[in-house]
């Protein structure tokens, strides 16, 4: 069975009972220091591009075709970055109001909200009279079903794969999103590392759904081998994803489906009334049996959630967290140094860097991501002051000065809510020389220059934030002051040269 959660004194969401006095000191210091705050809405970063996608991307080859259309491997003409472009042909949608079109738009709207290292990232999208065009990450490793069919999967490999799936599920479930069609074919491999680790991402959010606490869904969704019993009964919640995760782990290891039955109807009876077949699991460890048993609990009220599943012994025994987040002490010191130097960045630069980080290749930001995950002791995607203090002390092997830790934390907590999230951390810790190249600065300029006039105006900034709950008069005023200070021609606009100098000024601190 899973580990019992220790009943600790939780402070500001840290999950650690450290020094309460230190937390109070930080909060007082935080209140005494004023700074403009901007809460980033992913819908701002991921937006529709009003142009022809083939003006921005060069097609390398077609890598997939289906009834929906095709998937093309493409290269961004400005940056040289490799992407996948999903071209969905509108003529293949039987009816403009059909479920298929709704699924496409649903996937787009859901993916725009999510930013997680184990979920396929969407960068931008286009639409014309004939097609939808979704620009996403390109993952060269194929789907997990293909890998499982051709490669043996060890216990530790399966544990690390499921650990990553659970991290992603924990993230989307906290956002009130359920996937509803989790299966091997919808998990893609980004790479297989030398130590045998498969790095994965969940994709295909076409049937995903926003839910409310306490409400049960009625519409059946998913693939038959992976559907939870309560889904067949048309009364289910987000825990249907945990059931699917249990099926995935079972199939990865045994190469067999967990439920008997010669056809779908008979298999459905086993899922609802009899449960999974335990015999193929007898050769595996107690840790494997424990977590699969609790993920494939037929009573969803008793089934564990993702946060609980992450505490199971299997992930500690196989050291999954450290295997996935292998980052050296030298790298950590570099990231801490970057964070210290990030403190004077203003709201305009922060917005641009957030956009560039979102559009970076995973290799460019993997180090800070690993460091964040290493510090995130309770794996809730947020790190409070005490959790940060204790994590740094554990990593460095000695206590740092409280003033130094408070200063570092202040630079990370840009939203001033007494914790920092992954986006805030990566933005501060990333190597700015990788992010602020000429090509990428041009890309950021294009992001702000919505009318493609070659100039950025305050009206375009207001337009950018129009649908955001974070459109704050103080933030807009700060943007205006910055634009005015950069506008050497006094025409209320800034050009690429002015913007480039403005962004490269960040590098002077590194």
Annotate each PLM feature.
Residues 130-143, 147:
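Conserved short submotifs of the Hanks-type protein kinase catalytic core
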Residues 161-162:
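Activation segment signature within eukaryotic-like protein kinase domains
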Residues 125:
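Activation-segment/catalytic-loop signature of the eukaryotic protein kinase fold
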Residues 353-354, 382-398, 421-432, 457-470, ...:
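Amphipathic regulatory helices of Ca2+-sensor modules
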Residues 82, 87-114:
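Conserved N-lobe beta3->alphaC-helix segment of eukaryotic protein kinase catalytic domains
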């Amino acid at each position: 069975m899973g580990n019992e959660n220790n009943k600790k004194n939780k402070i500001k969401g840290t999950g650690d009972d450290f020094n309460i006095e230190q937390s109070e000191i930080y909060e007082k210091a935080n209140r005494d220091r004023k700074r403009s705050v901007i809460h980033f809405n992913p819908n701002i970063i991921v937006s529709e591009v009003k142009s022809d996608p083939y003006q921005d991307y060069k097609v390398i080859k077609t890598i997939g075709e289906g009834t929906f259309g095709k998937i093309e491997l493409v290269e961004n003409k400005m940056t040289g970055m490799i992407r996948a472009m999903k071209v969905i042909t509108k003529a293949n949608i039987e009816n403009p109001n059909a479920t298929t079109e709704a699924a496409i738009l649903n996937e787009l709207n859901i993916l725009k909200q999510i930013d997680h290292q184990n979920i396929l990232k969407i960068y931008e999208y286009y639409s014309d009279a004939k097609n939808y065009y979704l620009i996403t990450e390109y993952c060269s490793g194929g789907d997990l079903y293909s890998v499982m069919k051709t490669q043996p999967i060890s216990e530790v490999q399966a544990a690390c794969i499921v650990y990553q799936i659970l991290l992603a599920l924990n993230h989307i479930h906290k956002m009130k999103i359920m996937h509803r069609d989790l299966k091997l074919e919808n998990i893609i491999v980004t790479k297989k590392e030398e130590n045998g680790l498969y790095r994965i991402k969940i994709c295909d959010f076409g049937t995903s759904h926003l839910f409310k606490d306490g409400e049960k869904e009625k519409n059946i969704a998913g693939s038959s081998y992976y559907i939870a019993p309560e889904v067949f009964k048309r009364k289910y919640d987000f825990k249907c994803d945990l059931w699917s995760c249990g099926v995935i782990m079972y199939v990865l290891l045994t190469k067999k489906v967990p439920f008997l039955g010669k056809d779908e109807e008979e298999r459905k009876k086993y899922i609802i009334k009899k449960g999974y077949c335990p015999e193929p699991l007898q050769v595996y460890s107690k840790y494997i049996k424990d977590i699969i048993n609790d993920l494939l609990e037929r009573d969803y009220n008793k089934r564990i959630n993702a946060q609980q599943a992450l505490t199971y012994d299997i992930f500690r025994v196989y050291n999954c967290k450290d295997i996935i987040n292998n980052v050296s002490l030298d790298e950590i010191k570099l990231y801490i140094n970057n964070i210290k130097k990030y403190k004077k960045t203003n709201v305009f630069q922060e917005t641009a860097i957030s956009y560039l980080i979102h559009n970076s290749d995973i290799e460019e930001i993997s180090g800070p991501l690993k460091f964040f995950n290493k510090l995130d002791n309770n794996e809730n995607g947020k790190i409070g002051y005490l959790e940060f203090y204790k994590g740094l002390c554990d990593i460095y092997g000695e206590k740092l000065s409280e003033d130094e830790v408070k200063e570092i934390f202040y630079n990370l907590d840009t939203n001033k809510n007494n914790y920092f999230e992954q986006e805030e951390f990566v933005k501060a810790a990333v190597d700015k020389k990788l992010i602020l190249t000429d090509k990428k600065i041009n890309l950021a300029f294009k992001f702000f220059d919505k009318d493609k006039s070659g100039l950025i105006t305050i009206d375009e900034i207001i337009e950018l934030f129009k649908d955001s709950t974070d459109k704050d008069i103080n933030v807009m005023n700060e943007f205006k002051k910055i634009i005015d200070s950069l506008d050497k021609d006094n025409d209320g606009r800034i050009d690429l040269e002015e913007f480039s100098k403005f962004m490269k000024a960040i590098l002077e601190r590194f």
